[in-house]
Structures are given as structure tokens and as C-alpha cells.
Amino acid sequence: MNSWFLQVSKRLGPAGRRLWLLGFMGVVLAVTLGLALRAARESATQRTATYTELLQIAQAGQATAVEVSGDRFLVRQAGGAVVTAVVDEPTLRQELVSRFAGAGASVDFASREDPSRAASAVLPVVVLAAVGFALFTVSRRRSPKVFSDVKAGAARAAVRFADVAGMHEVKQELAETVEFLKSPDRFARLGGRPPRGVLLTGEPGTGKTLLARAVACEAGVRFLSASGSSFQEMFVGVGASRVRALFAEARKSAPCIVFIDEIDAVGRARAKGHGDSASAEHDQTLNQLLVEMDGFDHETGIVVIASTNRADMLDPALLRPGRFDRKVTVPLPDVRGREEILNVHAGPIPLQGEVDLSYIARGTPGFSGADLANLLNEAAILAAREGADAVDPTHIDRARDRVLMGLERKGVLVDEDERYATAVHEAGHVAVGLLAPSCDPVHKVSILPRGRALGVTQALPEKDRLMYRKEYLEDQICMLMGGRAAEMVVLGTMTAGASDDIQRASTIAWKMVAELGMSHLGPICVGDGHPSRSPALLDRVDETARALTEAQLSRAIEIVRSRRGEIEALVKALLEKETLGMDEIQACFPADRRPRPEDQAA
């Protein structure tokens, strides 16, 4: 039967199978609707009666025919009406039969089921059979002979290394992969073994996918891409089948690049023990991926490039040499890289002459390539909303505020007492930020509600930091405590506005003590999963971290007390203008003026 079905299916072809399936489903639907309508019509003409009503009909001689099926009576009256009733007691059924027969009605003992009951029994079977057949046909059509989630073809956009701004060291590392795909004999002549796989790791938005496309375009080979999550399914065996289909397509397309985005979805470390069915399906898919990466020869011209921002989750067997021979970290761009990225994304955006991309690059440390693209896009949207002909520095500055501090909520009505308390809180942050020597310069302060905050103080680093000194971290805690210190000194009370500051300060203090060894406890590490996490040691870590936070709060209180007059002047300016820039802030603190970053650069 199965072979006959397969032969007929091949003869029909894809279009014929679809038409046959649609026809079959149409017939099933017509039969189902017919049975349902018939049962509905019959039930509409019938009325359910009681035993007493049946006795009255029999005594009046209104019945012309009576059908008895078990405990069910169907009585047809002279006017065409149909009455049904269920009589459970056998003696009462016998009495009714005698009365109807005595009244001259024909009595028939029928064994057939009522049409409505037959329809209710047949309908579920027919519907389930139709749904099962449809699922069977669809599953055959979606069989993993061709992995539908693979995006094949040459690199879709002409992306080359020149279009990938920044990341000079990363591009040099990947250039050898391009040379291998272009001229593999150059490596084989000296017995060199080209890499089978390249793992790109880094923060989200740093351009890992863009780099993989650039490699394929530079080498002039096909680019097969798939997401790691597309290998995961609830059906057992589907993930492994899709892995086989992907590499089968790669062998046909060789030389080519197979790119697996977010490989941690399929390549995370296998759990110990048996686990549940979902873990078994994941392990089977991962095992198939490991086998496939070992299964092709170096001469096939297939290079697997994968990306992830969770390299710590990957299975060790996947990371060994012979599978992913090279691990390339794609870092966040430095100031030179940020300027190059801004130049690329600013190409289609009309900028006014005073827009300085190098200044923007210096003021956006920690931004990824995606963040910088989003920054310029937000600035262009603001300019278009205002009907401007070009993007000016104010648009970029407001776009940066939106990215860093959140959306401005102009419709929120804030009570005057809360506005004053918010201004005092933010002024405390500013005062500590100006006087603590290692703090990043305060760039802007605002008491306009943004996101979930009623006010924001923005401090921008002067340079990229590759490591953090103890003094810098202590000053960060002190600045975070500046808002609470101002509340205690100026308001004489405390508000809930410092909750986020306290949480961030506690996190920094705990890491300084528990992971970085920056306390009298010495160089210890009791982070998550570390074997030396004894309860007594954790208690000492908590006490030391709390003491560190309290010490910086006391220091912030002293700074606020020493600058009480300047803080009150800043509060007054904030209540008038709501948002103050660097020059307006330093006008309130003339004795604590810091040189601007552009002045230092000059």
C-alpha cells in the first residue's frame, strides 16, 4: 500500500499532489457539512417530550406511527410533528407501546441509530482522518531533503572588507581564510592544513555576521547561512536531519562558506546524565554537527564560520582543533574604529558642516557598530520630524540622549515637591562627579522624566578603558551615592529615587571584594560556581562590600556639605531650564571646572 502510494505520488508531481490534497479536503468538508446540516434539520423538526405528554398523545389518538429503539421513542403525529422521548423504566415502555397500539398507531421496533447520533459519531472520525492525512502530506513535503531555512547563494549583498569599518586585526585574521578559498594549492604545497572552522565571538552588534558575508564575497564563493535555533524542533530527529541536509547542500556547492549564526542555540554543552527528551534531541543534533564537521576533507573547500556572544556555553568537543580551529574575538570598536563606522553610516545622511564625527566617536565609548548606526538613524529621524534639510549637532546630541538615557516623557506631570527632590538628587550626583578625581566628566544633567527615571545625570568617559583601577571603581560608587547624600544633607530625608543607584553601587562593591581582590580580604574569588564559596567567607564578603559602600556614602556626604551653595545654585538652574549641558553645569561650580575633552585634544 505504501509503495503504491509513493508511485502515485511521484506520477502526480508536486502540483498534482497539491490538487489531489485540496480535492480530498473538499470532499471531506462537503460530507462533514452535509451530515451536520442533516442532523441539524432533523433536530429542528423534533421536540423532546415527557412521559406524561406521550400518554396524552396516545389517549388523544394523535399518533400515526411510533418507532421504538431501545429506551427511545419517536412519535409521528397527524399534523407532521415529531416528538421524541427517553423512557428508562421497562414497564413504562411496555405500557406506552400498549396504549399507542390500542389507539391505532403503527408501532415499529427499529434497531437503527438516530441520524444525529450517527453524525456525531462519524464526524470526529472523519475530521481526525482528514487532519492526519494532511499532516502526513505536509510532513513529507517538509522532509529535510532540502533544508528550507538555509539561505543559499552568493553573498547577497556585495559586502567586502573595505565596507566593514574598523576591526583591522580581525580582518587580517580572516584574510587567510579568503586566501585558502581562493588558492588552496598554496597551502597544500607546503603541507599546511587550512582551517575547517572559524568561531567569531563578541558582544552583540559588533559585526560578526557582516564579517562572514565579507569573507564569502572576497573569496567569490557561495554563502550558506542558517540560524542555530532553526535546528531545534520538538520532533525527535528533525534537528539532526537538518544538519545533514545543510552539509549535503554545502558539499554540492563547494567551495563555499557555511555560516551558523548564534551557534550556542545548537552547540551548547551537553548536560550530564540522561536528561529529558528535549535534552536528548539537542544532544542528537549536536552529535550530528560534530560528525559533519569531521566528515569533510580539507580538499572540499568548505569553511564553517559560526558566531556567538556566549562562547562559554559551547560544548568543548565543538571547540577542539579540527572543528573550530580558530577563535576570533570581535571586540567593541575603539575611537578610531568608531569614527570609521560613523563615516560609513553617515554616507547617505546629509550632515551640516559643523558635525564633527571624530568628536562623536570620542563621546561614544562602549558603543558597538549597531549602536552607532542606530545613533545616526535616530538623529536622521529627528531631523526629518522637524522638517530640517540636514542633520545638525543638536539632532545627534538629542539622539545620543535618547539612546543612553531613554525616551523623554514630556506628558508626565510631576509635582513641584518631587521636581525639587529630583533636582537635589541629580545635583548630588553632579557635585560628586566633579570633585571625585577619577570620575568620568559630567556631560549633561536633566530632571525631565526619561524611561523609568525622573531625572538623569550623564557622565561620558574621556577615553576607552581597557582596565579599571581601584580608585576609579571607588569614585564610581561615590558618585552613585551622591544622590542619596544630597537627599540626606539638603532635604533631611531619603527617597526611593536612589534605589537603582544603591543596586549598581552594591554590585560594584561586591565584585571588588569577591572577584577582583580589592579589599583587606585579599585576592579571593567567590563568584558563582567557584568551589570556595563557604558560608563564613560569603558573610565576610558581604560585610566588607557593605562597609565599602557605606564609606563611599560618607565621603559623598562630605563632598555635598562642602559644596552646599553650588548645589543649591545648580538646583535652581535645573528647576528653571530642566536640562543643563556641561558649560551650564560648570558655571555653577566655577572652582571645580574641568578642561573639556576637546580642549585636552587640542
UniProtKB/Swiss-Prot annotation:
InterPro entries per the UniProt record, alphabetical: AAA+_ATPase (IPR003593), AAA_lid_3 (IPR041569), ATPase_AAA_core (IPR003959), FtsH (IPR005936), P-loop_NTPase (IPR027417), Peptidase_M41 (IPR000642), Peptidase_M41-like (IPR037219)
Cofactor note: Binds 1 zinc ion per subunit.
Annotated ATP binding sites: 202-209
Residues annotated as catalytic: 426
Function per UniProt: Acts as a processive, ATP-dependent zinc metallopeptidase for both cytoplasmic and membrane proteins. Plays a role in the quality control of integral membrane proteins.
Top class in the EC scheme: hydrolase
Subunit: Homohexamer.
GO molecular function, one term: metalloendopeptidase activity
Species, as recorded: Sorangium cellulosum (strain So ce56) (Polyangium cellulosum (strain So ce56))
Protein's cellular compartments: Cell inner membrane
This protein's encoding gene: ftsH3
Periplasmic topological domain residue ranges: 40-117
SUPFAM superfamilies reported in the protein's UniProt record: FtsH protease domain-like, P-loop containing nucleoside triphosphate hydrolases
Keywords: ATP-binding, Cell inner membrane, Cell membrane, Hydrolase, Membrane, Metal-binding, Metalloprotease, Nucleotide-binding, Protease, Transmembrane, Transmembrane helix, Zinc
Membrane topology: Multi-pass membrane protein
Stored CDD domains: RecA-like_FtsH
The keyword Methyltransferase is assigned to this record: no
Domain of life: Bacteria
Record-given protein name: ATP-dependent zinc metalloprotease FtsH 3
GO BP, sorted A to Z: protein catabolic process; proteolysis
Listed GO CC annotations: plasma membrane
Binding site residues for Zn(2+): 425, 429, 501
Gene3D superfamilies, per database record: 1.10.8.60, P-loop containing nucleotide triphosphate hydrolases, Peptidase M41
